[in-house]
Amino acid sequence: MSKLPSNLLEQYRDEGYIGAVDVMSPESALKIRQKLEAFEATQGGALHANQRSRAFLLFKWLDELIHNPAVLDPIESLIGPNIMCWGTIFWIKEAGSKSFVDWHQDNTYWGLSSRRVVTAWFAISDASEQAGCMSVIPRTHVGTTLEHEDTYDENNMLTRGQRIVNLDTAQAVSMPLRAGQMSLHNYCLAHGSGPNLSDDRRIGVSMHFMPPDTQQQVVEWDCGALVRGEDTHGHFSHTPRPQFDMDPECVAFHAKASGALRDVLYAGAKEKLGRL
């Protein structure tokens, strides 16, 4: 798929999401999985907490993914030709794990001024309902942001275990993906996911795109990757591109970038659980 057709643009505007956009073949997604798991093997286990966020600075293949036209063409349809990637986050649920993501709206704690931020959630492995795929509640991206509370639940993958208070989930829509597909949703949309009850890891990565006129309202310094077009605003420092995995220049920049993200996400929190 290149640019989004009018019916999907209308759905995104009205409902706040689009499901199952093809990015690459399952075979190509498997190659990405193999690269990720080969890196995990070199360090003796799963990604460390600080490696989960903004890892496009660590892995060349993830930098290539956020620049992939099959990702960016649909994004351009939604926010225009000038696109910055604010960050990426890995969402890995081990087979049979209790990990889940409670219902939440990302605009409550990302500190971004724009309501036009788009999350592209890319499936590195199959994300079925059994495996704990993401679900959304249509139309919650418009109007007043819903009340959230911090629970610090040890199984909630969010930074402070946040959840929406007294949410009616009767209209929830599941968005299963095969490996190599992505879903799109406005970051103001209520979304969440259940535990992985399958016998395989559920591996995904979220990519967060914004127009360059967006501003960070929580910390003085923040960064992003200019992935298409131009940035005439200069609100975010531009990130370097890795020439190979664990490029020393980018690893050093990542330490600062991931630290800034933690400062944003944990702002006002009573506890810092160290999940990113």
Region roles according to the model:
Residues Q105, L158-D168, D199-R201, V219-L226:
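Short, surface-exposed loop/helix-turn segments at secondary-structure junctions
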Residues T42, L189-L276:
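Non-heme Fe(II)/2-oxoglutarate
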Residues E27, E94, S128, G143, ...:
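Feature marks short, surface-exposed loop/turn motifs that line or immediately flank catalytic pockets
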Residues L58, W86, R116, Q130-G132, ...:
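Residues that flank catalytic or metal-binding motifs in active/ligand-binding sites
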Residues M1-L112, E149:
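Non-heme Fe(II)-dependent double-stranded beta-helix
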Residues E129-G194, T214:
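Double-stranded beta-helix
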Residues A41, I79, D126-E129, H141:
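Proline-centered turn/helix-capping motifs that create local helix->coil transitions or kinks
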Residues H104, G111-E129, P176, L184, ...:
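Short, conserved beta-strand element in jelly-roll/cupin
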